[in-house]
Amino acid sequence: MNISTKYVLYVDESGDQDVKKFRTEERVRGSDPFLVFGACLVPVKFQDEMRQALTTFKSEIGVKQLHSTDLVHLKTAYFCRKVQSMRVLLFGLVSKKETLGGYTKQIADLKDTEAYYNKCAAYLLERLGHFMSHAGIGPDQVEIVFEEKKHDYNKLRNLIGTMQNTPHDDRARYLSRIAPHRIRAQAKKDEILLSLADLTAFSLYQSVSKLHSNFGYPEFRYMRELRPKFWKNPKGEKIANFGVKYIQGPFKMNLEGDALKFALSMYQDK
């Protein structure tokens, strides 16, 4: 790790990047309807302390790995409650595949299954860059660690670099804070701090998706527990467009009922 590094952003996702055949109201079979990213910014000086705390917590609840999909409801809620006392800052992003429109065909034409993932990751990193700009944190002070998967991370680095060099792209302003060469990947089994990003992505996904395991209803408790840890509007309490990005917004996502109400609450400075 570079000596100038003061923070590490750990990133994981929930859902998948397949945009060809995904579940909709009309199609009950297929890939996940959402791709959701979760990220946790950890100060370097507290990393070892947090690793020890997570290792102790893992033993306390009697699990081998802190993978949110493997935890029962009460253990997940307890995990979220534990995060409240940690020195971390959370970020998230939600994309609903139905809103992609013509972009779906564009990806298919490119035969690039990673393009959608990278574009969503760039939106997430824009949220980090916004925070860094507000806090006066320089590009070389933050390292970015994605949960390792079969993915060409050079394409992501190149995308960030290209966007930074495109003046008419509004996102370039905040992405200028991101150093592409500081992006890397690490296996979840080798870094327990990635479990915090995993929990964040899982919790955000649960708040928008109709879950078979929950009788067709989303689950909001996890996000309610985590909400205080998300970066928010410095002048209020709003986290949407600060710590969380809903691409296209809750209405164009066709969120309904309690899921829509909950997502809209993220836009409120209450």
Regions from the language model: what does each represent?
Residues 1-270:
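Phosphate-ester processing/binding pockets and catalytic centers
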